[in-house]
Each structure stands twice: as structure tokens, then as C-alpha cells.
Amino acid sequence: MEALKTVERFRVIRTIDVAVTCYPERTYKAALTAAQRTVRRLVKKDLLRRYRTDRFQTVYGLTKKGADWLDEHGVEATSSVRRVSDMTNPEHRLWLQFLVLCAEARGLKALTESELLRELNRGVTDVSRVRQGYLKVRVQRPQGAIERDLRPDFVAFEADGVTWGEVDRSKRGAEREASLAALVGAIGRTAADGQVVRRMVVFCKTERIEQRALAVLRHLALELAHHVLIEGRFHLRETEPGIFEVWTALLSPLPGGRSQLVDTRIGHVGVQRLPIWLPKVRVDSSNRHSTAGWFNENYLPYRKDGGWG
């Protein structure tokens, strides 16, 4: 049932989504083998239908029979095959929902961008009050600074705050690079739902995209290091390749009603590769792709300071 509920939720899935949802405790090859068996069985029963996208990705949609089966088992559902058949390149949505499922496999609540917007606007009837952004930031541009409402590709909620996730399938232009720098400056601030943004992770499809994102952050770190750390300013410190700590100065009370500024780490920023090799893995001896990055490592849904335990 979990596999069918997942395709009802996202409307389109890959086999790797079933591996994450149903078999995250297994090794990757074992999880993939079990997921392939599950998907084949559901396709044979006409509960799922298989499609190939223009980019030669195999995806699955929920059939009318599959939706009826879920309805009979207490899950409201509708067929998605017509919508899936019209999709040409759903790669971005496939990756962000994969990362959401990975976060949930770690025991976190997680939402895609569209799910987050629905939650932010639940019960809102006045169109003028509909929220389109999750966090307001000040973006520096050559023409001057402007305020922008930004929203993540996905979010994951941890005990200390929220993780803001970005999926970069292409190199950022100047506008998006400026937005990336602005988001770093927003670490530690409160988002529209009252959650504090503690982490931002940028997932990059290629090494070139990854290196450019790292260059933006390293340049920002050098610029910020020239300024003394005081309240309202922040420093960005790379502690290991692709992982940065965000520091600021916060007032700490002293005896006698006095206070002092104390350097305080308020969050993290990470840059890492999308695990595009995982869907390419074959379970037989012909496999030439790595299985690195599965749940036995500190990689999914994102690299975490101190690991996942």
C-alpha cells in the first residue's frame, strides 16, 4: 500500500522512490531489488502504469484501478496516468520528492514546495492573503538591493529548526546566485510558519554546477571575513569541503544587568551532488555504477554535521 500511497501523493514516481519508502533499512542493491519486484507486481495488476519520458527515464503513474484500490482501503485517490503521459521532463520534481522521501525515512517531517505552500495557505479564503513565499530576503544586485519572497524546493523539519533544500539542475545565473547569497544571510531567521531556518542544502546535478555554487559561497565567505563579527553580521566558515558553518555575534547577559557579544554558530550551509548514479544501478553483475550515498552513509537526505546517528 505504501508504494501506491506514494504515487497518489506525488502523482508520478520512480522505482527508487519505492526503495526509499518501503525498504530504506536494506542495503541499496537489496532495496532496489525488492522495489523492482514490488513495481512489477503493481504494473502486472494494472495498479500502476509504466511510462518513458523524453529523457528516457522510466516513471509510473496511478491507474484508475489503482486509485479505486486505494479508495477501497480508506485512502482518497485519483488516477494520474493522463497527467504522467503528458510529462516531458519531470526530473526536477522527481529529485525533490526523492529527497523528501529520504528525509521521511530518517524520521523527519518533510514537504515539497507545493505541499509547503498548501500548508501555509490552509484555511485562507481571501486571495489577497495567500502566501507565495516562505522567507523574505534582501537580494543585493548591481542596480541596488531588493526584497524578495523566496521559497525552497523542499523543506525538512528537525528539532532545532528547518532545513531549506534547493535542487540545481543547471548553473545559476547572476540573479539566482544573488538569491543564494541572500539565503545564506537568512540562516537563523524565522520563516513564514514560525520555524527558524537552521540549514540550507544545495543539491547539484553536475560537478560544474557544484563547483560554481561552492565558488559563490567561498567568495562570500572571504568578503564577510574582512568585517568584525558583530550583532547583525555573519561569517561563513568552511569546516570541510562543501560544508559551511554560519556564525554571528549574539548578546549574552552578564551579572549586574550587563551583557556581552558572544560568537555563536547559528546554522549550516551545504553543497553536495545529487546522487544521479543511484537510479542507474543495476542489480546484476553488469552494474558499473556506484551504490554510495545510501542510508548507511551520511549523505541522504543531506550531509549532516555530526552524522545521522
Say what each PLM segment does.
Residues 29-39, 143-150, 197:
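Glycine-rich, flexible loop segments associated with nucleotide phosphate handling
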Residues 104, 109-164, 169-176:
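Active-site metal-binding core of divalent-cation-utilizing nuclease and nuclease-like domains
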Residues 22, 39-43, 99-107, 184-191, ...:
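Hydrophobic, Leu/Ile/Phe/Ala-enriched alpha-helical segments that form helix-helix packing faces
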Residues 34, 91-95, 175-179:
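Soluble or luminal CAZymes and related metallo-dependent hydrolases
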Residues 174-178, 185-309:
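Non-catalytic C-terminal interaction segments of nucleic acid-processing enzymes
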Residues 1-86, 308-309:
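Nuclease-adjacent, charged terminal/linker segments that flank catalytic cores
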Residues 73-116:
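Amphipathic alpha-helical dimerization/coiled-coil segments
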